[in-house]
Amino acid sequence: MSYELVVGLEVHCQLNTNSKAFCGCSTEFGKPANTNVCPVCLALPGALPVLNQRVVDDAIKLGMSTGCSIAPHSVLARKNYFYPDLPKGYQISQFEEPICLEGCLSIDAGEGQRDIRLIRIHIEEDAGKSIHDIGDDTFIDANRSGVPLLEIVSYPDIRSSKEASAYLQKLRQIVKYLGISDGNMEEGSLRCDANVSMRPRGESEYGTRTEIKNMNSFKSVEKAIEYEAQRHIDVLEAGGTIVQETRLWDADKLETRSMRGKEFSHDYRYFPDPDLVPIAVDDAMLDRLRKELPEFPEARAARFVEEYDIPPYDAGVLTAEREIADYFEETVRVSGDGKAASNWVMGEVLRTLKEKYIPIASFTISPERLGELIGLIAKGTISNTIAKQVFEKMQELDEGPQEIVRKEGLAQVSDTGAIEGVVQEIIDANPAQVEQYRSGKTRIFGFFVGQCMKEMKGKANPAVVNDILKQKLDEGMTGDA
């Protein structure tokens, strides 16, 4: 029997606010245990939560960016369950009346565009953290308690592990473009749970689903879904039944293992939080937040193609990350040359980032200095070959390209007299190659150019070298005739 994979994703996105969702405590990562806490975080008697407005703004921005309807009235609810790192005994979340409803993400997993529908986006707070690796005891760190999250829940529209990965990457791109999260899966800023089921191909009814947790990279999401899908098939074909449960992905053993029975919404006994008023969203707020939305990748890529006359593929690469796109545009502003800026950013800059495994924010060459370097090439001050040497030195030294060119004596030689002398020396030293050229084997012209550039240590203006070489070699051909 042929089976169809059905996947829905629940993604928790940690917001990069300075303070927590319902108190003024810092969200700074890596602080000593239980230092970013207050009576609200610790659920001390009488402590009352106050909603962070920035959390509401970020939720609405994400909702707008994914085509959701923004609720004019939404409610914060208590999700009741017991866990040692949940001080209050409940988590503040949203249930029946979330802030964003019915959106969509368009993805391309290699087989064309597909729309993955969103059920909802809602606000909630993170729990604390249990620490098990200190002796035989378990300790609680409440620093993370109350850190703001947005939960993004998709419909079960995903049909392959590749689509699941593409969906997550698209969502990560959006939250990074919005500037509401760093979207780092490895550090837990973007956490994904996958609901997986199988059904006979052609059937409309869904099979029993299992939930997979503990996936901290796009690749682990793919592998976990593929493993779980095959496990379902093996159980079904052996005549067994799938148990609805939560399973953990083991990245070392490349398998899932049972964690607990799957909870249902009624298990959490949701009810409106009496300490928090409902969230009211009016047209003025929507207008304000709509104006704060950035230009998104698809629109920005189309503009790059039109405005800078670069290929669609290049525009797609340059706009994949907002910081790269910003860097490129600033380089264009300084250099005035979109094509050259595209070539340098896509070539030398991205190569360097990949080799050093660093983000563009840590790159030592500013877009202004890269723009100056491109300008020196355009003016004929240096050649492309020398420019790459200058580029490498700019990474080592805190100096601009003009200063490096001056100090190192790298300025391009365009003096026809000096170049003509070298050209004549090369011609005189290679009579056999001259004869080949003059007998019609003009492809050997590149040999002469290379010899001239080598003799002048790459500083000669290639255009001037080409002109003088061609003139001298062609003169000989005319004379023989």
UniProtKB/Swiss-Prot annotation:
The family this protein is said to belong to: Belongs to the GatB/GatE family. GatB subfamily.
Taxonomic source organism: Prosthecochloris aestuarii (strain DSM 271 / SK 413)
NCBIfam families: gatB (TIGR00133), PRK05477.1-2 (NF004012), PRK05477.1-4 (NF004014), PRK05477.1-5 (NF004015)
Gene Ontology molecular function: any one: glutaminyl-tRNA synthase (glutamine-hydrolyzing) activity
Superkingdom per UniProt: Bacteria
Entry's Gene Ontology BP terms: glutaminyl-tRNAGln biosynthesis via transamidation; translation
Pfam families on file: GatB_N, GatB_Yqey
Broad enzyme group: ligase
EC identifiers of the protein: 6.3.5.-
Catalytic reaction annotation: L-glutamyl-tRNA(Gln) + L-glutamine + ATP + H2O = L-glutaminyl-tRNA(Gln) + L-glutamate + ADP + phosphate + H(+); L-aspartyl-tRNA(Asn) + L-glutamine + ATP + H2O = L-asparaginyl-tRNA(Asn) + L-glutamate + ADP + phosphate + 2 H(+)
Keywords, ordered alphabetically: ATP-binding, Ligase, Nucleotide-binding, Protein biosynthesis
Transmembrane segments: none
SMART domains noted in UniProt: GatB_Yqey
PANTHER family membership: GLUTAMYL-TRNA GLN AMIDOTRANSFERASE SUBUNIT B MITOCHONDRIAL AND PROKARYOTIC PET112-RELATED (PTHR11659), GLUTAMYL-TRNA(GLN) AMIDOTRANSFERASE SUBUNIT B, MITOCHONDRIAL (PTHR11659:SF0)
The protein's name in its UniProt record: Aspartyl/glutamyl-tRNA(Asn/Gln) amidotransferase subunit B
